[in-house]
Amino acid sequence: MAVNIIATRAAPKMASKKEHQYCLLDSQEKRHGHYPFSFELKPYGQTGANIIGVQGSLTHVIKMTVFPFMIPFPLQKTHIDDFIGGRIYLFFKELDMQAVSDVNGMQYHFEFKVVPVSPNQVELLPVNNKYKFTYAIPVVQYLTPIFYDLSGPLDFPLDTLSVHVDSLSNHIQLPIQNHNLTTGDRVFISGYKHLQTIELCKNNKIFIKYIPPLSSEKIKLYIPKNRIRIPLYFKSLKNV
């Protein structure tokens, strides 16, 4: 019995190259109205004004790398022993279709070892700092990081507050009660170029030795110890 063999030509493969993009998710540049964190990544943009700038577009992402970084103690924790198992997990909401699932059904992209650094901060050391996607992510425009441990999601103290300043009595009225500011903390007041030291902290008022005259009574108070910066490195596959 004769067999007909039909020869076919394979479709030519598109040549591809790998591009690398570095970005720093800075909590002071999070999107307005999104708590606790949500970031917009803008191609060829400049970091600032609530934008995280990247050199090129984040398309066809095949791998994501994270590096060690610092975080303040979450609101749910007061001591290093409060971190169950000494681990924290990081999950990106927009990438939920591809993530690691643990035995409890919780998803994450990175696992970290928690290392104490000071009474206010811990360092997160990646257990495995690379996550490879099974299928390339078409585009990454927004990233919403969610932190949790085995007890559940973790919330963090704010790193920026809108405050009322009284230059005559050298005190600042804080809009919240559950802040983590204490005497001796360093803060930055918008409109003034130097860090200030808190002389006294009483309820939701902080007193500073010298507050310069400011053009507006309602200004921004930046709290360096609460700032979170997540360093990420993306690898993309581009057709050429």
Swiss-Prot record:
Keywords: Late protein, Virion. Induction: Expressed in the late phase of the viral replicative cycle. GO terms for cellular component: virion component. Its main location: virion. It is found in: Virion. Belongs to the asfivirus H240R family. Forms the penton at the fivefold vertices of the icosahedral capsid. Together with the minor capsid proteins (p17, p49, and M1249L), forms a complicated network immediately below the outer capsid shell, stabilizing the whole capsid. This is Penton protein H240R. It comes from African swine fever virus (strain Badajoz 1971 Vero-adapted) (Ba71V).
